[in-house]
Amino acid sequence: MSTQSTHPLKPEAPRLPPGIPESPSCQRRHTLPASEFRCLTPEDAVSAFEIEREAFISVLGVCPLYLDEIRHFLTLCPELSLGWFEEGCLVAFIIGSLWDKERLMQESLTLHRSGGHIAHLHVLAVHRAFRQQGRGPILLWRYLHHLGSQPAVRRAALMCEDALVPFYERFSFHAVGPCAITVGSLTFMELHCSLRGHPFLRRNSGC
């Protein structure tokens, strides 16, 4: 379940506007790179959940992942996550896990199948202070490159609302039909993206 051509950028590091508290993952700024992409760790879970909760609760009334589920995936498969940090603060992230069936199912919301070859993208979220800056597309582009560097991952899959399908189609995702997963009264479209046959996706994102 997710939110937002691009090339990897090295943007200037914007600062959080006055009145917006820093994420718990922030560290001393003078020792940190201005802009950094890296895989998340369980220590980033609280920061990720705060961003996700604000992004999704007001729109959908639910979160794709709750705090214990974020910790679960960042413990089992941190290599399937990617965070964008500005001066040590998490500002955007993607969390995924492996799946071993042709299509997503209800249990794929909470399971990581270590022998699977499909990366299930659970959530893409951007901090409210950094939206409308093109960060979602840049992060997704970097994430697909990162997945492409992992030989076991052959395909990416996600579920989203119909209105977001055109956004993901820009990244070579294609709709395969309605998703079997429902959340309350919400229904979703399932999208897949092959990581084979796309050489530009095989570059390492440096995560």
UniProtKB/Swiss-Prot annotation:
Binding-site list for acetyl-CoA: L124, A125, V126, Q132, Q133, G134, R135, G136, P137, Y168, E169, R170
N-acetyltransferase domain ranges (all copies): 35-194
InterPro entries associated with the record: Acyl_CoA_acyltransferase, GNAT_dom, SNAT-like
Listed GO biological process terms: cellular response to cAMP; circadian rhythm; indolalkylamine biosynthetic process; melatonin biosynthetic process; N-terminal protein amino acid acetylation; photoperiodism; response to calcium ion; response to copper ion
Domain of life: Eukaryota
EC id: 2.3.1.87
PROSITE patterns per UniProt: GNAT (PS51186)
Key words, A-Z: Acyltransferase, Biological rhythms, Cytoplasm, Melatonin biosynthesis, Phosphoprotein, Transferase
GO cellular component: cytoplasm; cytosol; perinuclear region of cytoplasm
Catalytic reaction equation(s): a 2-arylethylamine + acetyl-CoA = an N-acetyl-2-arylethylamine + CoA + H(+)
Disulfide bond sites: none
Region (Disordered): 1-28
Residues that, per the record, bind substrate: L124, M159
Pathway terms, separated by semicolons: Aromatic compound metabolism; melatonin biosynthesis; melatonin from serotonin: step 1/2
Subunit description: Monomer. Interacts with several 14-3-3 proteins, including YWHAB, YWHAE, YWHAG and YWHAZ, preferentially when phosphorylated at Thr-31. Phosphorylation on Ser-205 also allows binding to YWHAZ, but with lower affinity. The interaction with YWHAZ considerably increases affinity for arylalkylamines and acetyl-CoA and protects the enzyme from dephosphorylation and proteasomal degradation. It may also prevent thiol-dependent inactivation.
Function summary: Controls the night/day rhythm of melatonin production in the pineal gland. Catalyzes the N-acetylation of serotonin into N-acetylserotonin, the penultimate step in the synthesis of melatonin.
UniProt-recorded name of the protein: Serotonin N-acetyltransferase
Origin species: Homo sapiens
Gene that produces this protein: AANAT
